[in-house]
Every structure is written in structure tokens, then in C-alpha cells.
């Protein structure tokens, strides 16, 4: 992906500098250009580098394709209710770059940002200094890998791989695999390993889950029709706390389906509570597995309750669906 060659404005003034050339930075660039505001986008590596280098082979979107709505470039492919795989996501981003031709300068890392003495902001970069009237930070919340400190206590002979570096089951050494965490990445990687026949031990956390489909529609579609995605942080009951919430686990793999850890357990996956300690090759877990599973199920059921209430309140014609208890 390339937006062409742009010269870095060393020592100069730019009305707006956008930091980060991923989907957020590209979207900001589109909106600034539409408003006629001069700007540059500084990307430390290359456009969509994280997508190209820090996703596993079987990666696919969790939300339906129709929800891909980069400004000025909504998804127009043949499968709006499907879930793009990695190569398709990259193709979508490449198409966006070609369509909007953003003023991205690649290979320039911002190392310091401070308020300027004459107003605005001074940026120090690997290509020199620049002054900006305004700065948009679009570097993303997941670009720095987070590894539990307990990992340092594991023996050197045990291979450790961060989710951003995981590619496929075949790349891992033979033997059982312990997956730490049940956010979206942890659950999807655990499923990837499980489907490949690997022995998987999964340390759970408090991440909630959500059903893939309910009462005739993808749950994401229901939430969109209910106005959930138009709710701002300011209007949300949790306020700023909502920014720190863990995303619900579900998958778009093979057409999309629930991720139910209890079902995985019936198929041989070993589930545990939160990882507490490491003593040599022995791992100690909290006694909170049942609470973690029950909590995830409770959130999934509460979302269904909300959908039921909205259907009833608005007289929507939707097929009934059994609410079966957990496995």
C-alpha cells in the first residue's frame, strides 16, 4: 500500500499533523481533505503495516462487511453479511488509499510531542522537527504488545509467542499450547489451535461474549438498528469507563458463529481461571473459572434481552428463538 512520495516539511509549519497511517489516520485524512484543511499523515512504518504484519493467517473480521464504512468508501463487495479474511481487508484498505490519495509520509516516527511556545504543537520526529496547529493522534490502542510480567518467570525452553506474532498452529513447536486471555484474539487463536487438533489449555478472564446471530439477524445488525453504534461516550451510561471495556468475543470465521468456551471444553479443551503465578513449569490459576464463564454468558443473555425489548417496543416482526441454558 502506498500513497506516493511526499516530502517531509522539516522545520516548517503544517495546519494539521495526523500521527498514524492505519484506518483511523486515513479516515482523519479524508475528513480533513473534505474540509479543505491542509495536513500531512506521519506513519512510522508503512500504511496498514499492522494489518500486513501482526495478524494471524486465519484472521477475519468479527463484524459484518457492511459495517466497513471508511469515510467516503463504504464496503461495496458481493458479501455484505460476510466477514472479510485478511487478504480482503488489505484489499479494501488498498482500494481506499488509491481512492483518496492521502498525504502520507511513510517511515517517519514521531518521538516527542509538546505544546509550542507560539501556540500549536511541536513534533520531534526521526526526520526532523515540525510545527502543527493541531495534531490528531491515530496511532491506535493496540500497536504496542502487552505481555504479562509473569512471562519472564517461565523457563527459557518454553516458547512464548505474543498474539501479534502468532501466524498458524504449524509455526508453533510440537506439544500442548497454553493461551493466556479470552479477549477476541485469545479466543480466536485458541479456536484456531483447537481446530488444528492441538491440545489447548485456555486461561480465561472476564471478557464478555455475544451471540453471533439472534432472532433472524446478526446481533451486530440488531444493535445497529437500535442505534447502539451511534451512541457516543458522552451519552453512554458508563461514560469514559466504556473506553476501557473489553470487547465481546465472537467470530466471523467460516461464515460466523458463536465462540462458546463451554462447548470447547466438551471437545477436549482445558479451561482455567486467570493466571496468577508461575513456578518453574507449573502454572497456578485463580479459582474463578465458573465466575468468568457465567459472567460472559450473562452478558450475552443480557444483550438478547435488550434486543427482545426493542423488538417488542417497536413491533418488529422477528422469529422467536429458544434461549437454551449453557452447556
Task: Show which residues each predicted segment covers.
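Flavin (primarily FAD) cofactor-binding/catalytic cores of flavoenzymes
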Residues: 2-21, 27-50, 84-327
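N-terminal glycine-rich dinucleotide-binding loop that anchors FAD/FMN and/or NAD(P) in oxidoreductases
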Residues: 54-80, 219-236
